[in-house]
Swiss-Prot record:
Signal peptide: none
Subunit description: Homodimer.
Highest taxon of the lineage: Bacteria
Gene: dapE
EC number: 3.5.1.18
GO MF annotation list: acetylornithine deacetylase activity; cobalt ion binding; succinyl-diaminopimelate desuccinylase activity; zinc ion binding
Family of this protein: Belongs to the peptidase M20A family. DapE subfamily.
Residues forming the catalytic site: D72, E137 (proton acceptor)
Binding locations of Zn(2+) 1: H70, D103, E166
Hydrolase keyword on record: yes
UniProt protein name: Succinyl-diaminopimelate desuccinylase
Amino acid sequence: MSLPDTPTLALACELISRSSVTPEDAGCLQLIAQRLAPLGFVCERIDIGGVSNLWARRGSARPLLCFAGHTDVVPTGPLDAWQSPPFEPTIRDGHLYGRGAADMKSSLAGFVTAIERFVAAHPDHAGSIALLLTSDEEGVATCGTVKVVEALAARGERLDYCVVGEPTSVKTLGDMIKNGRRGSLSGTLRVKGRQGHVAYPHLARNPIHELAPALAELAAERWDDGNEFFPPTTWQVSNIHAGTGANNVIPGVCDVLFNFRFGSVSTADALKARTHAILDRHGLDYELDWHLSGKPFITGRGQLVAALGNAIRETVGVETELSTTGGTSDGRFIADICAEVVEFGPVNASIHQVNEHIAVDAVEPLSKIYERTLRALLTA
């Protein structure tokens, strides 16, 4: 690997070299805190349940602009499928390769170097700057950002703006900002029947047969029409299981896992109620447990979207697109204490894949976009 030629690239390489497979942090937060402390940041570790969390803040005034992200990465997959070791950052053909290069250690490096330059140029800037970082985003995400948000809320700390460094760009750096995400509501359904011999169906009740019409109705249901920010709500079955494995036994139960992805038109409670109404109408004997892993959030065209969009245009000459597509992120937790939350980072085409990479010539511009956003929001 040739030596990194910019501070952001050097820090990205140092972070990638740390094997922080979720929920491990591998010293990434300590490294970042060591860079922030000399700038006047108060760095607070909020470690919970084996998860490493960092809340670092400079200043006490409003507005508060927070950069948020995660140090953990997904597992590498088969090592022999990588062209170079995943935790040995390698520059090849104009790209930086390594696990976390795009998701999201280059963003973390960009946060830090953007802040360093901004504070050097504006030591008496308006408002406050913060970083909220966790090692529990790629895993179960129960002891990470959500717990830090709870701790901040308990002591009355609120954010005005938050940029989550998720890799949102599609084809080129800056072409997409996520200004919201759909909610995710999962159901675990068990329909009860009566087990019996397939030759004597009159002595049994087949839960698969009883459930099938209800599933068809749920699949055909139009839950809402969406709105300007979100597509219509979707309902999908992810798993169905019934039976003993024998072909002569009618099963006694049928288990189904399903999921809603929903925007701001429908609420989780409304979707639950409509689901129960359909199941009840079919006369099923059932149990249904729910898990809401994230509520939808949306940030309109306010100050943060304008500042970030202008920063992208000034840095890379791209007119960005706002989108709410894709899965959930930690933005869903931060939205509880922050009025304006967006996600922005590098191209996501290689994330969670072998040979994950980011274009070398996108690393420094990413940091400059973050710096220009700081300047727009925290200088007079």
